[in-house]
């Protein structure tokens, strides 16, 4: 049923690559299969791009910079992005169904991602002609000013968990600054990424401004990173691969934006509004089956309200339902058998812990689907591996703390620094703790701020470096030139 539903919503080829505004067969003539994680069935084939394909894509982008794409004004680029946003919005329902089946994400979450994609292109379309340089007071007879210019050709390596969201925030910002892009989506889930090629043509983007080359990371991704004509790399994925990306990029001395892992805490003080906090505490941990870099996998709670919190969270946890993605329940499957195995192996480390609550499976789930029950563990020591390492699954641990100082110490005890949340009504405490937390984002009495296309996003430590989203991302996708004119 899902295969027919998928095909009914596809309006572009999935088994080709997109270079210079055209769909074509990859030079390797090889294909990779895409599975539906809800039932393990093969739902599509994609191209297995090789070095020749990557070279053609980069050359196409380079040529576009020298003619049709590079000749556009900032406002003209902005109008193209606005048109792309409109086309995405017109296809929200199609894209949501495709993403839900491809990634295994509940339909309502996939629809939110499609709407976010449209908003990213809208935001960066509006920002395209708002980038300004500065004039700098200097010596007599000098006029000094700065210019913001594109890097040139940017490479974008996109993960499987949020293809649309991450395309929106990296491709959108890069195009707004005038870069030409080569996109290498994940081989595990890339069907909505391929839609961007078709939509770009419909919007009127010049040939070569956007190129899409799916394939294996160790082959297509590696070739893209090593290509001598790539001027900037944006990578979202694991810490392990992020280190390799940065190492290879360093050989060509090109800048890299890394958005990697997380072990993000929510800190619940004794004066917190628990009724308001509860949906955030749970949803931030189980959204997309916990396969989110900014997932809140650690819940730090004051010992004064520990018993009350676990009672309330446990009751809600037991109501969570795992089902096929298209059935639109609380959780769908994880992406693959490999990811399920990783999560299962971590759960084997929990034998010394108390599982205080878990969700339930929907009846008659397909046997070949990659399903994992959400689990909540109580009274966990902050040094435990389940409290230190990124699991990338629906597993949350509750860690009690003594006081504010103890909470800060525990929150900062991992290698990561992506997101944190503070729940307290004490304004002075809000400011103190927000300043003390080692994290790229801190939310106060909320978590995620509703997605926040406008809000800069990025990490510290093992969570990576550089910033995506918001106006700040435009600076990362540009270089600064200083011009000093002497008037004699």
Residue locations for each model-derived region?
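ALDH superfamily catalytic-core signature
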Residues: 240-381, 444
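Glycine-rich loop-to-alpha-helix module at the N-terminal edge of alpha/beta enzyme cores
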Residues: 41-131
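Hydrophobic face of amphipathic alpha-helices that form TPR/SEL1-like repeat modules
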Residues: 1-38
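Conserved C-terminal structural/oligomerization subdomain of aldehyde/semialdehyde dehydrogenase
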Residues: 41-44, 230, 267, 371-488
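Residue-level signal for inorganic ion chemistry
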Residues: 40, 77, 99, 121, ...
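Rossmann-like NAD(P) dinucleotide-binding subdomain of oxidoreductase/dehydrogenase enzymes
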Residues: 133-276, 328, 401
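Short, well-ordered beta-strand elements within core beta-sheets of diverse protein domains
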Residues: 43-49, 66-70, 156, 266-269, ...
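A short acidic/small-residue loop/turn micro-motif
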Residues: 25-27, 31-32, 47-52, 272
């Amino acid at each position: 049923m899902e295969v027919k539903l998928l095909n009914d919503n596809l309006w572009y080829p999935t088994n080709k690559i997109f270079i210079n505004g055209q769909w074509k067969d990859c030079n390797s003539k090889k294909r990779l299969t895409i599975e539906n994680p809800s039932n393990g069935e093969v739902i599509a084939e994609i191209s297995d791009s090789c070095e020749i394909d990557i070279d053609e894509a980069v050359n196409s982008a380079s040529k576009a910079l020298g003619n049709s794409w590079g000749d556009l004004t900032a406002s003209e680029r902005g109008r193209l992005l606005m048109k792309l946003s409109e086309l995405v919005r017109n296809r929200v329902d199609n894209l949501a169904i495709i993403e839900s089946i491809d990634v295994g994400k509940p339909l309502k979450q996939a629809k939110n991602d499609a709407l976010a994609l449209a908003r990213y292109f809208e935001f960066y379309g509006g920002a395209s002609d708002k980038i300004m340089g500065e004039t700098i007071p200097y010596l007599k007879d000098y006029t000094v000013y700065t210019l913001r210019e594109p890097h040139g050709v940017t490479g974008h390596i996109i993960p499987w968990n949020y293809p649309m969201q991450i395309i929106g925030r990296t491709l959108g910002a890069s195009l707004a600054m005038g870069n030409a892009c080569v996109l290498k989506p994940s081989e595990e889930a890339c069907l909505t990424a391929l839609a961007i090629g078709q939509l770009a043509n419909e919007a009127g983007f010049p040939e070569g401004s956007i190129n899409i080359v799916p394939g294996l990371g160790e082959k297509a991704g590696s070739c893209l990173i090593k290509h001598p004509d790539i001027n900037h790399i944006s990578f979202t994925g694991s810490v392990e691969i992020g280190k390799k990306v940065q190492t290879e990029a360093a050989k060509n001395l090109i800048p890299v934006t890394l958005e990697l892992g997380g072990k993000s805490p929510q800190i619940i003080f004794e004066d917190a509004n628990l009724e308001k906090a509860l949906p955030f505490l749970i949803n931030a941990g189980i959204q997309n089956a916990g396969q989110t870099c900014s997932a809140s996998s650690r819940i730090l709670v004051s010992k004064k309200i520990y018993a009350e919190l676990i009672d309330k969270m446990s009751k809600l946890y037991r109501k969570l339902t795992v089902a096929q993605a298209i059935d639109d329940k609380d959780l769908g499957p994880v992406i693959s058998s490999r990811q399920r195995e990783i999560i299962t192996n971590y759960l084997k480390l929990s034998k010394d812990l108390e599982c205080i609550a878990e969700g339930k499976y929907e009846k008659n789930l397909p046997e070949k689907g990659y399903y994992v029950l959400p689990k909540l563990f109580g009274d966990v020591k902050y040094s435990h591996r389940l409290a230190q390492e990124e699991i990338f699954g629906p597993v949350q641990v509750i860690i009690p703390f003594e006081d504010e100082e103890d909470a800060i110490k525990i929150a900062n005890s991992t290698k990561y620094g992506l997101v944190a949340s503070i729940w307290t009504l004490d304004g002075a405490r809000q400011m103190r703790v927000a300043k003390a937390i080692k994290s790229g984002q801190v939310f106060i009495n909320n978590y995620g701020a509703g997605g926040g296309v406008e809000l800069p996003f990025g990490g510290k430590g093992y969570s990576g470096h550089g910033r995506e989203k918001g106006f700040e991302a435009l600076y990362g996708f540009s270089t600064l030139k200083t011009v000093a004119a002497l008037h004699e």
